[in-house]
């Protein structure tokens, strides 16, 4: 099986810069997403707390879209492309790869103000990437954690979110 990014959080940068800080924020999201979605079963994916709510898989679809917006900002490309149909495994892989690529770009950037969210002719500064899709994705990862606990499949208790590692 192919090794996906974020089974552990990458080693932190040696210095604090806007780029390394934004990168680390995305790395934290990637690590949480990796372990939140690891070992999900069909019963977890279809779970929703009530008829009006999104299912776990619909929430994962939304997180995939958010990861694409984050990546597109770092690629300096417009948003609005439709995702192809994918299996859960493919969505998970694509989301993790999107986050990893965006993080790497930001980590080595001296000027993150060059990265903007582009919707048609409208450009929004990187601040909006932070309080928009990054914050929203973190929020929704928490929802999937709650949903999988409710469907009887809690996340691995050996995850150490502070250190970004798995306890032995």
Q: Each predicted region: which residue ranges?
A:
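Bacterial Sec-dependent N-terminal signal peptides
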Residues: 1-5
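Short, contiguous alpha-helical
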Residues: 10-11, 24, 34, 45-81, ...
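Alpha-helical packing segments of well-folded alpha/beta enzyme cores
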Residues: 22-25, 29-36, 66, 91-105
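Surface-exposed helix-capping loop/turn segments at secondary-structure junctions
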Residues: 39-45, 106-114, 149-155
């Amino acid at each position: 099986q192919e090794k996906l990014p974020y089974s552990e959080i990458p080693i932190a940068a040696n210095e604090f810069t806007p780029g390394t800080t934004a990168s680390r924020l995305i790395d934290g999201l990637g690590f949480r997403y990796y372990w939140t979605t690891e070992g999900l079963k069909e019963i977890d994916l279809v779970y929703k707390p009530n008829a009006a709510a999104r299912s776990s898989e619909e929430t994962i679809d939304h997180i995939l879209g958010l990861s694409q917006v984050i990546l597109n900002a770092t690629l300096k490309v417009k948003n609005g492309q439709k995702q192809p149909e994918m299996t859960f495994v493919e969505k998970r892989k694509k989301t993790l790869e999107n986050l990893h690529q965006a993080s790497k770009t930001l980590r080595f950037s001296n000027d993150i103000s060059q990265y903007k969210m582009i919707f048609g002719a409208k450009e929004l500064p990187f601040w909006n990437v932070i309080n928009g899709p990054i914050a929203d994705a973190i929020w929704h990862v928490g929802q999937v954690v709650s949903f999988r606990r409710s469907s009887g499949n809690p996340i691995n208790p050996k995850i150490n979110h502070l250190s970004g590692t798995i306890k032995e």
